[in-house]
Amino acid sequence: EFGADLGQQVAFLGESGRALAAAVRHPGRVRWRDTLAIAEEAGVNALPIVTLVAFILGVIIAYQSAVAMRQFGAEVYVADLIGISMVRELAPLMTAILLAGRSGAAFAAEIGTMRVNEEVDALTTFGFDPVRFLVLPRVLAALAVTPLLAVYADVVSILGGALILLTFQVPLVTYFNEVFTLVQMNDLLGGLFKCLVFGLVIA
């Protein structure tokens, strides 16, 4: 049974990869209206929870770090910690967890219901590819919204850290100058690459 399930998973991954490659070669055949609708549900409607979690994360990191760094008069370096940790690691990971829990579960439930109601079999009977009609729009939507949500989480968490450091007498100009000086484009690109991988795995 385990071998059969594993074989089905491998076959599904192969079909999904084939559909994704076909979408790159022939973008006009992609169901963009469905993709945009799914992206709105998975991305735009997730903004409130992403905002809340990212802001709280930035506040907690800033406060805990600033309390320790104040002993050495180095509160300003908390900006470096927030910038690097959020852009490289925490924002992509947090976004992926939220997307998996919220949108990934919705994807599975929706397609599972269609499977039970034999809608997937009906598509196959009428000569339509279920992977192209059902799976591909969700994969493309996840690939699109995961990096965007991560960048948004970066901004929100950095703003949350800025508010905390204001209470430690660190000026906003100094804070943002420290963040933008230390965080490089390679850090952002590395985080975005992780987002693409997470989005693909979740979808």
Task: Mark where each language-model region is.
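Short cytoplasmic-facing helical segments at TM-TM junctions of multi-pass membrane proteins
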Residues: 110-136
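Short helix-terminus and kink motifs of transmembrane alpha helices
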Residues: 63-67, 97, 101, 105-109, ...
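Short, membrane-interfacial amphipathic segments enriched in basic
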Residues: 2-36
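Hydrophobic alpha-helical transmembrane segments that constitute the membrane-spanning cores
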Residues: 53-60, 100, 137-165, 201-202
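Hydrophobic alpha-helical transmembrane segments
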Residues: 2-12, 41-55, 91
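Membrane-interfacial helix-loop-helix connectors in multipass membrane proteins
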Residues: 32, 63-88, 155-192
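Membrane-helix/interface signature in polytopic inner-membrane proteins
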Residues: 33, 43, 70-77, 108-120
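Loop-to-helix entry region at the N-terminal start of transmembrane alpha-helices
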Residues: 41, 45, 49, 74-107, ...
